[in-house]
Amino acid sequence: MNSLEKAVWRSRYLSRKTKVRIFGSLVMPVLLYSCEAWTLTGGLKRRLSTFVCNSLRKIFRIRWQDHVSNQRVLEMAGMSCVTCQIRLRQLRTYGHVLRCPSTDPARRILRAGEPRGWRRPAGRPRKRWLEQLEENLVNVRVTGLAAARTYAERSAEVWKAKVDAAKRLPGACPHT
């Protein structure tokens, strides 16, 4: 990341638009690699958001004294927040997995519960991927996994339209 900062972000020869496009095409795919399988915790959300906003602040040469909000920085870059991008990717992946045959390993993992004889550790249970997915479905205006299953199994186009509509809903992303 330091080499990008020295060679690209500080460059006076590249426009800010070009720098944002480089950020979106080189940094974001690496940052979000396999994010479809993550369970987002509060700490992970904060660290991802901090990294993205700090990088964009370097691109736009915004100092901390300028008092520019993270929302404004994302608007300047024409990006949505990282957690919302991850949520949409997870929803797309869920629809894809539901359309797989029932013998597919990914589909079987979704149906599998806890192994027999296994006990959960003491303390507050960690959030599971399916529990997080149920929360994400609220943003798509789908109530419950059963309703999501019917939409996703109908066709890829129906599910894609439902997920894409979630991007445009007001309040779909509470962070922006």
Label for each model-derived stretch:
Residues 1-176:
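Short linear motifs embedded in intrinsically disordered, charge-biased segments
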